Every structure is written in C-alpha cells, then in structure tokens.
Amino acid sequence: MNKPGTWISFVIIHVIFMGVWGALIELPEKNGFPATLGYVVWALTMIPATIVAMIINKWKLDYDKRSVLYGCLSGLLGAAGQLVLFYTLKTAPAYLVFPILSLTPVVTILLAVLFLKESTGMIGWAGIGIAILAIFLLSYVPPDNASASGYLWIILTIIPLVAWGAQGFVMRFANDTMKAESIFFYMTISSLALIPVALWMTDFSKPINYGLNGPYLAAGIQILNSFGALCLVYAFRYGKAIIIAPMTTALSPVLTVIISLIIYAVIPHIITVAGIALAILSALLMGNAESKMEKKTDIKAPKSALIK
C-alpha cells in the first residue's frame, strides 16, 4: 500500500467523502428522521470502518491505560461535537455551519500555546485573526434569509468547534504513543457509548420517518464520514502532514459549501461570501501552522479532523 502517490489518493477520497457528507448530513432530518437518531446511525457506521482498520493492523490493539484514556477522551470529544452538530443543522444550513467548523485548528493551536508553551508564528496568529473576522462576518444574517435566524446557531456551532479542536489537542499525545487504528477503535467505542444519550434526547412521541429517505439515507451519508476519516488516517501515515493538513482542513468545507448552495438554490449575501472565503483562508493558514508546530516538537501530526 505504501507506494509513491498513495497519500494523495487517500486525501482525494477524504475530501470528496467529507465534503459530500457535510452537505447532505441534514437531509434525513428534514425528511422526518430525528437528528438524535441520525447520531445513532453515525455511531453504528463507525463499526465497519473500524473493522477494516483492525484487519489492516492485523487486529493489534494498544490497550495500556494511557492508550485507553487518550483514545476514549478523543472519541468522547469527537462524539459530543457530532451529537451537537446534528441539532445545529436544524437551525442553520451547512454552507454557514461548516466554514466555521473548519476553524477547529484555532482551538488546537491556542491550547498548545497555553498549555504546552509552543509558539505558532506569524502564520498561525494571522490565521486566528482572520478566523475571528470570518466568524463575525458569518454571523450576519440578512433579514430576508429564512434558512437561519438569530444567533443560536452560532452558539451551537461553537460547541463542536471547541470539542473538535480539543480533540485535536488530545490526539497530539495519543498519536505519540498509539497506532492510528487503535485511536480509531477507541473513538468508535466512545461514539457507541453516547447512543443511550441520543436515544434519551429523542422525542419518540412525534412521528418518525423509518423509510428509505430516513435511516437508510442517513446510513448511506454517515458511512461517508466513517470511511472518509479512515482515509485521513492513512493519508497522514503515507504523506507529509505539512501538505496534508492544510489540504484536508480547507478543501472539504469548500466542497460542502458548493454542494449546500446548490441544494438550497441560493446565492448568499456578499458579506456571507466574504466570511466563507476568509474562513477557508484561515483554515488553510492554520492547518499549515499546526503542521509546522508538530514538526518543531517532533510529535506526529494531529488528525484533528479524524472524527467529525
């Protein structure tokens, strides 16, 4: 598998899968399949991807206390962010939400600066500054825009943003001592562990669509996420993080935005367009800065986008 150019194949698959997933994730909920049950389907689709990962790794699993702690903590942060994301997309369209979510490196970098006393350099700080401006612009919703109103959607979006950024920070330590397949395994276990919470949050007194465009459509969409995440694992394994991190951080949201705009058949306000563009630029800069920080500290590159 480790041939020249292998990593680019994994990057392309990851970008396509995650970009399409981001744009379509809200469709089952709009068809009457609750967002909380969408989380349940997502967690279950992690199982086949994990089986593939474990087969590739010949069923070897890191099971010391540190590995279990880092793996499960990473998984819980990712799963909690995912659970909130499903609800967030009930209040705002994907073309507004995902550009903000692409800014997860802001949190990862700030945590590294605060707790590890690392320096991010001018590129990182520029990315953070642009990110703040992007969020400010994206918070503007024209009065005639019925797809999003108020500021609740921004607050909800910040929750997975912080959770996934913290996940990336934790994974800096996990990647230093664990195989990627083991991290993936514990993430799946953690995701499955939150299923009872999702079921508890579900209002079963309301009609639920159990048809083809409900849970079955959700499964088809969520499998893109699980295998897209697995492709990212191997992209980092066979390629250079300083190239892969900016590409994957920036390109997936671009594809999500394009597809989402087509689905909604809207032309966003010029201020929104500027916010989207700045968010993507910020993600590109911070992905590059984050990779350089990893290289300086001799720690493997974090897969902060591993599970989303």
Question: What is the predicted role of each segment?
Answer:
Residues 15, 19, 23, 51, ...:
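Hydrophobic/small/kink-forming positions within alpha-helical transmembrane segments
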Residues 6-14, 60-84, 152-160, 207-227, ...:
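Loop-to-transmembrane-helix transition segments
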Residues 30-37, 83-100, 176-182, 231-248:
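Structural motif at transmembrane-helix junctions in multi-pass transporters
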